[in-house]
Amino acid sequence: MRLVLLGAPGAGKGTQAVVISQKYNVPHISTGDIFRSNIKNGTELGRKAKEYIDKGLLVPDELTVDIVKDRISQPDCKAGFILDGFPRTIYQAERLDEILKELNVELDCALNIYVPDEEIIKRMSGRRVCSKCGMSYHIVYNQPKVENICDSCNGELIQRDDDKEETVIQRLNTYHKQTEPLIEYYEKKGKLLTVHGQEGVDDTTKEVLNALSGVKL
């Protein structure tokens, strides 16, 4: 299974990617995780990426394409992979096609998880993370026992810069302008599947697995 996950930030792509990864025994490749790791470790790539991420902008193509090419060329991707956060532009999608051609493989499908903007804003701006251990919470859906205090280590809960409402709105605007055209791109190639992700996680998972069961591998 070689799969691209599409959908606005906060649509639940990462959650569903874990399920799909376990079901099809292929690695989940999140460009967001790669960038966050580099930012945390203070690498040159991390410093460059942080400038864009903090403003709610996309990391430039040339920074992203090389990372993805290297990752999907690894032995554990021979049987497939799930790309989460890439491609985000038509140019990146075209570059991905070139990379796959070089590897003599094809993309099986692009799965689009659709969630309305209002729900995305509610989900993302309500996120909180522990400043000590990194555990995730939500002020509506997953509250700590004591407000703003981590259940596990008593660390202070903070809102990441890219989860602030004004940044979320900027990220959505960027998504609609630059990433949404990918839906049409993959639809024209006959690779697009769309599921609705505004219900609970379990309902979305059922819809995702049902949609993927019809993909010819």
Swiss-Prot record:
This protein's pathway: Purine metabolism; AMP biosynthesis via salvage pathway; AMP from ADP: step 1/1
Region annotation LID: where it falls in the sequence: 126-163
Keyword Nucleotide-binding: yes
The keyword Transferase appears for this protein: yes
Binding site for AMP: 31, 36, 57-59, 85-88, 92, 160, 171
Residues bound to ATP: 10-15, 127, 136-137, 199
Gene Ontology CC terms, in alphabetical order: cytoplasm
Segments for region (NMP): 30-59
Protein's cellular compartments: Cytoplasm
Keyword terms: ATP-binding, Cytoplasm, Kinase, Metal-binding, Nucleotide biosynthesis, Nucleotide-binding, Transferase, Zinc
EC code(s) of this entry: 2.7.4.3
Assembly, per entry: Monomer.
Domain-related comment: Consists of three domains, a large central CORE domain and two small peripheral domains, NMPbind and LID, which undergo movements during catalysis. The LID domain closes over the site of phosphoryl transfer upon ATP binding. Assembling and dissambling the active center during each catalytic cycle provides an effective means to prevent ATP hydrolysis. Some bacteria have evolved a zinc-coordinating structure that stabilizes the LID domain.
Described function: Catalyzes the reversible transfer of the terminal phosphate group between ATP and AMP. Plays an important role in cellular energy homeostasis and in adenine nucleotide metabolism.
Protein name: Adenylate kinase
Organism: Acetivibrio thermocellus (strain ATCC 27405 / DSM 1237 / JCM 9322 / NBRC 103400 / NCIMB 10682 / NRRL B-4536 / VPI 7372) (Clostridium thermocellum)
Top-level taxonomy: Bacteria, Bacillati, Bacillota, Clostridia, Eubacteriales
